[in-house]
C-alpha cells in the first residue's frame, strides 16, 4: 500500500515506487468496443459487464458504451502508463471466427503502437485456436507467419456447439502437431474457471499430463491451473477429479516433475 506522504515527499515516493522488480503480466485482455462482433449482441445483453469499470466515464453511458472501458485505450493506459508492468501477453477469449471481440490484426496494431511508445517490444501476442471448429487449425500457419505470435491460446471446455475436447482428442492433437510443424511450441490452455455444467469434464486438467508426456518438445502453459470458483483448495487430495489437485495428479501419473514442460499459472485467476 502506498502511504499518503508519498504524494508529497520525494523520498517517500521513491521508497514506494522505485525498485528493480520485473513484472510480466502473462494474460492481458481487451476488446474492440465497436467491432463487427457487437452487431450480433442481442438487444439488452451486456457482454463483459462483470469487469470492474470503476473510474471509467463510459461505464455510465447507455448501451454498449461501457465496452470502451475494456477497449484498447484503457488497456494501454492501465498496463503501460499507470502500472509498473514491464511485459504483457495479449490473449484472446474463445469465439467463433466471425464473432471475435478482438481480431489478430487489431492486436498486432496495438502491439506496434506500444512498441512505438515505449521504444521496445513489450506486448506479446497469443494466437487464438479453437481446434474443434472448422478453419482454426488451418489458420495457424497464417497466424505464425504474419503476426509473430509467441504462443497459442485455446479453451478446451469451449466449442461452437457447446461441446469441448481434451488435448489428446483428435482436435487437440491436430493443434499440437501443427504448432510443432510451425515452430511455435508454446500452448496456453484455459483450464478451470469453468463456463458452466456443459462439457465440464473438459475444463479439468486430466489430459495435461498425458499430452505433456507425449510431446516433451512442447511447452504447456496451464492458465488458472484448473482452479474452480466456489470450491476450496486445501491439502492435496488425489481422489479429486477437478481443481488444482487434478492437475497435480495428472502430472504425477505421467512422470512430469520439476523442470518439465508444464507451467502452472494462477496469478490471473
Predicted segments with their positions:
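Aromatic- and acidic-residue-enriched segments that line the glycan-binding/catalytic groove
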Residues: 36-48, 101-107, 146, 197-208, ...
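Catalytic pocket-lining loop regions of alpha/beta-barrel enzymes
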Residues: 150-151, 164-269
Amino acid at each position: 500500500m502506498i502511504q499518503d506522504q508519498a504524494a508529497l515527499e520525494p523520498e517517500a515516493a521513491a521508497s514506494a515506487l522505485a525498485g528493480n522488480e520485473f513484472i510480466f503480466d502473462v494474460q492481458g485482455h481487451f476488446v474492440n468496443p465497436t467491432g463487427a462482433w457487437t452487431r450480433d449482441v442481442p438487444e439488452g445483453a451486456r457482454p463483459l459487464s462483470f469487469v470492474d469499470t470503476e473510474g471509467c466515464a463510459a461505464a455510465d453511458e447507455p448501451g454498449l458504451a461501457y465496452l470502451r472501458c475494456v477497449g484498447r485505450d484503457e488497456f494501454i493506459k492501465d498496463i503501460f502508463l499507470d502500472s509498473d508492468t514491464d511485459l504483457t501477453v495479449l490473449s484472446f477469449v474463445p469465439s467463433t471466427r466471425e464473432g471475435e471481440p478482438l481480431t489478430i490484426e487489431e492486436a498486432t496494431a496495438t502491439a506496434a503502437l506500444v512498441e512505438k511508445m515505449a521504444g521496445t517490444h513489450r506486448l506479446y501476442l497469443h494466437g487464438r485456436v479453437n481446434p474443434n471448429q472448422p478453419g482454426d487449425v488451418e489458420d495457424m500457419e497464417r497466424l505464425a507467419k504474419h503476426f509473430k505470435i509467441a504462443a497459442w491460446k485455446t479453451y478446451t471446455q469451449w466449442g461452437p456447439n457447446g461441446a469441448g475436447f481434451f488435448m489428446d482428442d483428435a482436435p487437440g492433437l491436430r493443434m499440437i502437431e501443427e504448432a510443432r510443424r510451425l515452430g511455435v511450441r508454446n500452448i496456453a490452455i484455459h483450464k478451470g474457471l469453468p463456463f458452466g455444467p456443459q462439457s465440464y469434464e473438459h475444463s479439468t486438467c486430466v489430459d495435461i499430463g498425458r499430452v505433456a508426456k507425449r510431446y516433451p518438445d512442447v511447452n504447456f502453459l496451464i492458465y488458472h491451473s484448473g482452479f474452480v470458483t466456489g470450491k476450496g483448495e486445501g491439502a492435496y487430495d488425489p481422489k479429486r477429479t477437478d481443481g488444482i489437485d487434478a492437475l497435480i495428479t495428472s502430472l504425477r501419473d505421467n512422470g512430469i516433475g520439476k523442470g518439465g514442460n508444464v507451467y502452472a499459472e494462477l496469478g490471473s485467476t
